[in-house]
């Protein structure tokens, strides 16, 4: 970057702005770096995003093809073996976890996601900053090339921000990655856009101060449209990034939710105003609007009560019932007309008459069957909507409410029937995400040889939340299903003998040997490492629970990948260990 001053080749950047020599230098510098040539920086920013999506799209196609072919013919060849080894190396590093303190800076916990964001940031910063022309000789010669580059790149990121904001979005459709897992990238793209926007602003301020001091800067902010129109979108984008931090969302979630979409609309409108059709940058905004609007319309017509079917604009009746005294209750929706879901998916529920503007995601604890099984949700009262509903139940024990269903969303595009070994691990109400996998595998034909269901609960009476479902799965699945329950609390209202007697009294021919119940807080690391010797060729691990549990499981599964890429050394026949984590149900 050249040294700055108030003159250029003997010309004062302000006093000589109308001279012939000044105009000559202006045309000369514009010819060196034409203003319109900067549009390529926006295009290559979009190309980078499209290339990333394409790689994820190919990955989804391969996995679906591999699952389908393996389900019909359990065999591998040299080509698939090489791919399996390459994938295991990627998972070995990708599943590893970063130190917890880094997540406070909105850095994702997994090494894989963090590495992608680092490389993306490196690409964008180098592409923006490395071209050595940052400024022109005088501000009057034309906008700073650095400012134009950064502004166009920030605008090019806008379509990705709005696409990733949708629960039903085009990127999920193409990649199979659910929106809640893409939310990290939604936040990252917003922060990247904000940083580029700041880089876009700095050269204008710097040159104005260098050439004419604060009075010159003040005059431009007062009289120049390009200056004063850029203030609102920059402030709004900064607020959107700051208020999206996890610690703020946890404290004032409902306030964040409603403020976020309102500021998102305001940001879009003010940015269109600021762009003012310059350099065709508004094309990116209209593209963002097209994706955004399409996604919203699709969600309204296919996922909500506006879906054109028998339940159009109608609520569904739900039965609510307390499950013990620990703030846990269940919601059962009997009428599931028009709603189809897969294991591991969740819905947003909006309760009529109870904070109607609020809705929350809850994992579906039941499976979708031909006889239209009811939707069951197990909810732990936290605060806000869930606490309000529980307080009403505290007086009534059971209650009926009208509820609007928005969903389903989430889950995994992998087919659990295509794995020979499935491990389901959950804590507390996280069982709502793993139980549907157990039920689905118990009731359908598949190549699965063994399903290990591991559930960690605080109290023994918590097992009653899904006791009947577990008994049915054990009866249907027989010896291929192992149910192992860990009761963390040593003291409980029920004794082990009392619970076993209740199981024996059921007409399911179950006894204490069918379910293994241990007492005391277990070591998840030890549980998974002990399973290493009994893994099959293709293995799927589903984990649902607290962030600390998911971090621990991810780290262990990362280590287990060595059974794949070192199978010749350890003499294992393991070809794949796939991990799927769920965030909802807590």
Give the positions of each predicted feature:
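Reductase modules of NAD(P)H-dependent flavoproteins
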Residues: 2-31, 181, 265, 377, ...
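Membrane-proximal cytosolic interface modules of multi-pass membrane proteins
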Residues: 245, 254, 258, 262-272, ...
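Ferredoxin-reductase
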Residues: 313-400, 457-458, 486-488
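Extended, low-complexity, polar regulatory segments
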Residues: 1-22, 56, 60-101, 374
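Membrane-embedded alpha-helical bundles of multi-pass integral membrane proteins
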Residues: 37-51, 82-301
């Amino acid at each position: 970057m050249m040294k700055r001053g108030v003159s250029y080749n003997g010309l004062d950047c302000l006093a000589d702005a109308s001279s012939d020599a000044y105009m000559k230098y202006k045309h000369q510098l514009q010819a060196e770096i034409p203003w319109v040539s900067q549009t390529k920086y926006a295009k290559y920013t979009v190309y980078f995003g499209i290339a990333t999506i394409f790689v994820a799209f190919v990955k989804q196609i391969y996995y679906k093809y591999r699952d389908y072919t393996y389900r019909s013919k359990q065999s591998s060849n040299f080509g698939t073996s090489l791919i399996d080894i390459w994938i295991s190396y990627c998972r070995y590093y990708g599943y590893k976890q970063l130190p917890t303190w880094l997540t406070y800076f909105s850095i994702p916990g997994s090494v894989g996601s963090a590495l992608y964001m680092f490389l993306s940031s490196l690409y964008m910063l180098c592409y923006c900053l490395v071209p050595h022309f940052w400024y022109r000789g005088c501000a009057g010669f034309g906008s700073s090339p650095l400012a134009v580059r950064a502004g166009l790149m920030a605008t090019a990121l806008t379509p990705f921000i709005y696409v990733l904001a949708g629960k039903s979005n085009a990127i999920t459709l193409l990649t199979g990655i659910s929106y809640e897992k893409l939310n990290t990238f939604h936040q990252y793209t917003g922060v990247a856009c904000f940083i580029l926007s700041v880089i876009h602003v700095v050269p204008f301020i710097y040159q104005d101060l260098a050439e004419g001091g604060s009075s010159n800067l003040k005059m431009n902010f007062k009289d120049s449209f390009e200056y004063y129109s850029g203030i609102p979108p920059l402030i709004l984008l900064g607020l959107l990034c700051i208020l999206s931090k996890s610690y703020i969302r946890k404290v004032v979630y409902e306030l964040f939710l409603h403020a976020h979409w309102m500021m998102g609309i305001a940001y879009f409108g003010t940015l269109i105003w600021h762009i003012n059709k310059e350099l065709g940058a508004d094309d990116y905004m209209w593209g963002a609007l097209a994706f955004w609007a399409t996604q919203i319309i699709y969600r309204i017509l296919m996922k909500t009560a506006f879906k054109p079917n028998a339940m159009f604009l109608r609520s569904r009746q739900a039965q609510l019932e307390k499950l013990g005294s620990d703030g846990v209750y269940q919601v059962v929706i009997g009428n599931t007309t028009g709603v189809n879901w897969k294991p591991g998916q969740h819905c947003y529920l909006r309760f009529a008459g109870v904070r109607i503007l609020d809705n929350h995601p809850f994992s579906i604890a039941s499976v979708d069957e031909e006889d239209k099984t009811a939707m069951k949700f197990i909810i732990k009262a936290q605060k806000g909507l869930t606490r309000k509903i529980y307080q009403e139940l505290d007086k009534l024990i059971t209650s009926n409410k009208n509820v609007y269903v928005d969903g389903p969303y989430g889950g995994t595009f992998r087919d659990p029937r295509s794995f020979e070994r499935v491990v389901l691990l959950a804590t507390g109400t996280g069982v709502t995400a793993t139980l549907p996998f157990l039920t689905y595998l118990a009731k359908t034909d598949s190549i699965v040889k063994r399903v290990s269901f591991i559930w960690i609960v605080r109290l023994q009476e918590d097992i009653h939340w899904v006791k009947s479902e577990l008994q049915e799965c054990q009866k249907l699945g027989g010896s291929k299903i192992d149910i192992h329950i860990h009761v963390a609390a040593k003291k409980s209202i029920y004794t082990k003998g009392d619970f076993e007697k209740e199981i024996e009294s059921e007409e399911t021919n179950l006894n204490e040997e069918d379910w293994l119940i241990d007492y005391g807080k277990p070591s998840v690391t030890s549980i998974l490492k002990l399973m290493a010797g009994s893994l099959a060729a293709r293995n799927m691990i589903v984990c649902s629970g607290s962030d600390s549990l998911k971090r621990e499981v991810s780290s262990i599964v990362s280590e287990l990948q060595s059974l794949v890429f070192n199978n010749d050394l350890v003499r294992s026949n393991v070809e794949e260990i796939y991990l799927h984590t769920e965030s909802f149900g807590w």
